[in-house]
């Protein structure tokens, strides 16, 4: 059996894997154990009471976290005319149509989010094999195909997170940075849970939000007692 690193031994000693911690305890524990030489992200895993094999029970969407994610987000927008000017004014780094598609085809993708107006999908549709595997393909379900591209750019810049359950019915996304204070991380988590509950499929029965765990980039998951959150399931 491989020897545990000193860091993992400390985590094992500090984190009780059988316990659910209050949100404030959980955040304090993450901060105590975040000893990496960079500012770690705080991520969340939410186990949903869905059957991910059924397409009508899959959960997908986006929400703006009240305190953002702590990341600088670069946005590319496929649009034209007045929408192009509006996208630039809203802060988009790259705006275009065929010229932007040519950059993507060359592999020049210096952006984190892609937004498109409906009239641009004829161009974007040709890029599915490039953008799709990278999770960058615009989709109306998460607000990245929209006639109001300026608002979508502002949301992306403000700290919008997109979420989609995996094959096990678990949502993975980010809540911010370990440098955020407890209130910021707690309110970001509560905002995400509110959005998830609004996205609950009508065919999903029983408890919808079954388990919530938070972790840092290099740390172990810490289960959160939902009773300590204002947005209880």
UniProtKB/Swiss-Prot annotation:
<keyword id="KW-0820">tRNA-binding</keyword>
<dbReference type="Pfam" id="PF00687">
    <property type="entry name" value="Ribosomal_L1"/>
</dbReference>
<dbReference type="InterPro" id="IPR028364">
    <property type="entry name" value="Ribosomal_uL1/biogenesis"/>
</dbReference>
<dbReference type="GO" id="GO:0006417">
    <property type="term" value="P:regulation of translation"/>
</dbReference>
<keyword id="KW-0699">rRNA-binding</keyword>
<dbReference type="GO" id="GO:0000049">
    <property type="term" value="F:tRNA binding"/>
</dbReference>
<dbReference type="GO" id="GO:0019843">
    <property type="term" value="F:rRNA binding"/>
</dbReference>
<keyword id="KW-0694">RNA-binding</keyword>
<comment type="function">
    <text>Protein L1 is also a translational repressor protein, it controls the translation of the L11 operon by binding to its mRNA.</text>
</comment>
<keyword id="KW-0687">Ribonucleoprotein</keyword>
<keyword id="KW-0810">Translation regulation</keyword>
<dbReference type="GO" id="GO:0006412">
    <property type="term" value="P:translation"/>
</dbReference>
<comment type="similarity">
    <text>Belongs to the universal ribosomal protein uL1 family.</text>
</comment>
<dbReference type="InterPro" id="IPR023674">
    <property type="entry name" value="Ribosomal_uL1-like"/>
</dbReference>
<comment type="subunit">
    <text>Part of the 50S ribosomal subunit.</text>
</comment>
<dbReference type="InterPro" id="IPR005878">
    <property type="entry name" value="Ribosom_uL1_bac-type"/>
</dbReference>
<dbReference type="GO" id="GO:0003735">
    <property type="term" value="F:structural constituent of ribosome"/>
</dbReference>
<comment type="function">
    <text>Binds directly to 23S rRNA. The L1 stalk is quite mobile in the ribosome, and is involved in E site tRNA release.</text>
</comment>
<dbReference type="GO" id="GO:0022625">
    <property type="term" value="C:cytosolic large ribosomal subunit"/>
</dbReference>
<protein>
    <recommendedName>
        <fullName>Large ribosomal subunit protein uL1</fullName>
    </recommendedName>
</protein>
<dbReference type="InterPro" id="IPR016095">
    <property type="entry name" value="Ribosomal_uL1_3-a/b-sand"/>
</dbReference>
<dbReference type="InterPro" id="IPR002143">
    <property type="entry name" value="Ribosomal_uL1"/>
</dbReference>
<keyword id="KW-0689">Ribosomal protein</keyword>
<keyword id="KW-0678">Repressor</keyword>
<dbReference type="InterPro" id="IPR023673">
    <property type="entry name" value="Ribosomal_uL1_CS"/>
</dbReference>
